[in-house]
Amino acid sequence: MTVIKKGKNKKKNLKNDDRYKELDSLITNGSEIGDNSGRSCIKRFFKIIGNEMKNNVYVYFLSILYLCVCVMNKVFAKRTLNKMGNYSFVTSETHNIICIVVFQLLYFIYRKTSTSGYKNESQKNFGWQFFLISLLDASTVIISMIGLTRTTGNIQSFIMQLIIPVNMYFCFMFLGYRYHLFNYLGAFIILITIAVVETFLSFETQSENSIIFNLIMISALIPLSFSNMTREVVFKKHKINILRLNAMVVLFQFFTSLLVLPVYNIPFLKEIYMPFSEMSTNINNGLRCLFYGQNTVVENCGVGMVKMCDNCEGAWKTFITFSFFNICDNLLACYIIDKFSTMTYTIVSCIQGPAITIAYYFKFLAGDAVRKPRILDFLTLFGYLFGTIIYRIGNIILEKKKMVKSQNSNDSEAELTCIETSTA
């Protein structure tokens, strides 16, 4: 039986090893290439990319799908903000209620159609994990709201992409991740692309920008990173269902979002500043704006003013569309973290920056927020994609080493078992 098991392991390892042959050829024979070294190296490089995409069609399809959903989520979030930006608390809590209903309904259907999986999960209590994720998400929102008040658009984009090194560091420290040189190189290329582009765009940056508030916004990446890592631990260690996680987290989030209320009473927050005495009036006006399309703030508002002008006509359509894509975004993000890792999710999501910018070129997507195309945006997207490819090559090499190590371990155990059997 041991010999048969050993044969199966060899067959499996040989099958898995096929995808790495081209990579081995590129690395091993790199020094043996003659006059056509450059052309041969490029040819091999693109052949590796082709084989990688062919062997991981599902991964790349899922990544593209998530990227499209994520872009639509951000675009319609911006369009919702343009219509009813004075009522962020109303939109936040209404969206939470919609998410509670949808996720609870989906999880109810899952329980009815998959009884065995539900029974296995129902024996475990994940209350503190749900509360921790909700609290981390609420903390991210609160800190980001404070930082955003004096952090201009271009700097916002740069700061959000810093999640790559932040996630790499915390995954290294707490989840035991180990990286290849190509992982660092890919992340470095992405960061350099961001730095160059944002430096170039800094000439367009508004004067109202504070380094203190920039640092506050950067600190929001810490709870965001820990939230993603907690999700990964819950998925990988406890094998919890994605629908159950989202159903419970959004339920906790409805209450943890109330922690945001004191933030609205901080005077230096300018646009979102709102005393507690005006809270009930704001909620009432927000509900009228969302469900009845009634404008309340129409005077002393607009560009350069403290408040935005209401544009509530058709607000509910834009808001429902945003909620739909946001729910899909959450499900796909959790699925990617569950099936792959936090870093895979981070690298895929970082491409959304230039993709969102390009989406604003199309009026049917961006509406009133449409912008003119710029070559710089396409160059940024190319830099992101190139860095992502280099990062993925690092993962391939690490997978190869892990597979070889596992193969050697299986062979050693099989040989030891055979020796013990023959001795007996």
UniProtKB/Swiss-Prot annotation:
Chain ranges on the Cytoplasmic side, renumbered to this chain: 1-56, 110-125, 178-180, 231-248, 339-346, 399-424
One Gene Ontology term, aspect cellular component: vacuolar membrane
Gene (name only): CRT
One GO BP: amino acid transport
UniProt protein name: Putative chloroquine resistance transporter
Main localization category: membrane
Membrane-side (Vacuolar) residue stretches: 78-88, 147-156, 202-209, 270-317, 368-377
Compartments, record wording: Vacuole membrane
Alphabetical keyword list: Amino-acid transport, Disulfide bond, Glycoprotein, Membrane, Transmembrane, Transmembrane helix, Transport, Vacuole
UniProt keyword Repeat, yes or no: no
Glycan attachment sites: 86
Organism: Plasmodium yoelii yoelii
Superkingdom per UniProt: Eukaryota
SS bonds (residue pairs): 289-312, 301-309
Membrane topology of the entry: Multi-pass membrane protein
InterPro entries noted in UniProt: CRT-like (IPR013936), Transprt_Chloroquine (IPR017258)
Transmembrane segments: 57-77, 89-109, 126-146, 157-177, 181-201, 210-230, 249-269, 318-338, 347-367, 378-398
UniProt record similarity statement: Belongs to the CRT-like transporter family.
A single MF term (Gene Ontology): xenobiotic transmembrane transporter activity
Role according to the record: Nutrient transporter. Involved in maintaining the osmotic homeostasis of the digestive vacuole.
Keyword Transcription regulation listed: no
